[in-house]
Amino acid sequence: MITVRLPDGSQREFDTPVTVAQVAANIGAGLAKAALAGKVNGNVVDTSYLIEQDSDLSIITDKDAEGLDVIRHSTAHLLAYAVKELFPDAQVTIGPVIENGFYYDFSYKRPFTPEDLLAIEKKMAELAKKDEPVTRQVLPRDVAVEYFKSIGEAYKAEIIASIPADQDVSLYTEGKFTDLCRGPHVPSTGKLKVFKLMKLAGAYWRGDSKNEMLQRIYGTAWAKKEEQEAYLTMLEEAEKRDHRKLGRALDLFHFQEEAPGLIFWHPKGWTVWQQVEQYMRRVYQDNGYQEVKAPQILDRSLWEKSGHWENYKENMFTTESENRSYALKPMNCPGHVQIFASDLRSYRELPLRYGEFGQCHRNEPSGSLHGMMRVRGFTQDDGHIFCTEDQILDECVAFTALLQKVYRDFGFTNVIYKVATRPEKRVGSDEAWDKAEAALIASLDRSGCTYEISPGEGAFYGPKIEYTLKDAIGRMWQCGTIQVDFSMPARLGAEYVAEDNTKKIPVMLHRAILGSFERFIGMLIENHAGALPLWLAPVQIAVLNISDAQADYAQAVAQNLKKQGFRVHVDLRNEKITYKIREHSIQKLPYIIVIGDKERDAGTVAVRARGNVDLGVMPVDLLVERLNNEVEAKA
């Protein structure tokens, strides 16, 4: 007798081994039809999986996150099937699930075209409509290698040949197409109804630039048509908001080939940067942080002690001088430990909070670089708190409250919280981990935050809280973090004198709110579609005259506003006022002041707010009051 335990606590008993599909049918015809896969004892499996002993089972449908992954994985195989039908000489390589979709890499004698993409998508729909069963078979490694060699799939044969000889491999077949895959997959192609091929790109085989350039086809797949339409609409909106386009259009910054992964900041863009930095400096000052500055380049010996040389060397920029090896810092923490350890510390000094606007460099692969979102040189609002285990809770509560306020001020009110707990390989005692994890969770409970637990996703040196922002068009951005570290202070010799006069090692909390300034400013630009709020806008007000007769008064108004601390541009060009208004509106300025004879004679200004909102005529003092209130409110 086999007992199958279901998520609602009920049980089903069977005399003989039973498949996931059979259990679903036993529960109800509707569930049997909706079943895409199953989760047996925590593992996602095909509906054909045979349950041979007492097990926990949940049936996965398109309402589950795992169901969407199965749909996307199976759609990647459907894409490969369609390509092989249309282009029999193409060779298939790999096709994983990615965020919001999938891709598949192909080797083919000529580049695919946009017209090919349309034909492939049409063929995919035809194959899905056939509702062909998707079946799984397991073969010894060497048999699988020979099979793929026999059908001319050299890349698949190479992948399988790299697997240990004593391991079996699983293959999935739908119609005439067979692919190597761990699975699971949908039971038949008819389950794949909503998909779209998105774009073509190049990708090196195995990610190595010495290998052949393959052709990558990206696609998206969803459970429901409405979900796909919403996603495509979001992509259209994201395209309009792309910080790379807006950076050029608004004269904020640019990129060029001579500096991959680095940014050329223009005066307006650097003004935005300075506003962000000045704001974060006040955050440091108001919350008990001491600002520090550590060297950007450090000797190899320090990186060896910290563990970075062993675990992170390929991502570090290195150099040599006078027979010594150095590296540009990829992160700020070792430098902060040096500052802490430079003096004899007492328990009375703890918690000791350091903050730095630290410039870091990481040798990211060129193919992964993306505007300001993925760069090689960046500045972090990096802070480290040295404390005792008993102080972790209070520090995390204070940090979460601070982070929430900062995000609100920048226009982000939707924050997702995640606690990443201990991995299998870790340093530190179980008791210390218990205490740290409990403190992180309790800090979110005390802060009134809803959160999820991610078991095993902490770093080897400690658990962490991740703070993810949801932007104006629904995209998620992981930004802030607070990370407990049991390892680095000990590795780098940080100690303090405890109350009992013994020397102890402090706990180190790594924390960042914005993360990378570059990435965060890119997010700000996209979240606000370039229309930055008044307090952040590089130019807050443009003063325009209608004719030369008002030029002196316009200059006087502008000078008055500048003295009050506002960033003002005066446009006295001999152009039509409608042209000047339109030009400054395109630059997304918060306010435009128009001055004609009436305004000059009355000592007033005509004010337009962004979005062509006419606020009418008012005295300059009233405008200043309005502007100050708006800056103060960070609206």
Curated annotation (Swiss-Prot):
The keyword RNA-binding applies. Keywords: Aminoacyl-tRNA synthetase, ATP-binding, Cytoplasm, Ligase, Metal-binding, Nucleotide-binding, Protein biosynthesis, RNA-binding, tRNA-binding, Zinc. Its cofactor is Zn(2+). It is found in: Cytoplasm. InterPro entries: aa-tRNA-synt_IIb, aa-tRNA-synth_II, aa-tRNA-synth_II/BPL/LPL, Anticodon-bd, Anticodon-bd_dom_sf, Beta-grasp_dom_sf, TGS, TGS-like. One of its GO terms (biological process) is threonyl-tRNA aminoacylation. GO terms for molecular function: ATP binding; metal ion binding; threonine-tRNA ligase activity; tRNA binding. HAMAP family: Thr_tRNA_synth. This is Threonine--tRNA ligase. It comes from Herminiimonas arsenicoxydans. The lineage of its organism: Bacteria, Pseudomonadati, Pseudomonadota, Betaproteobacteria, Burkholderiales.
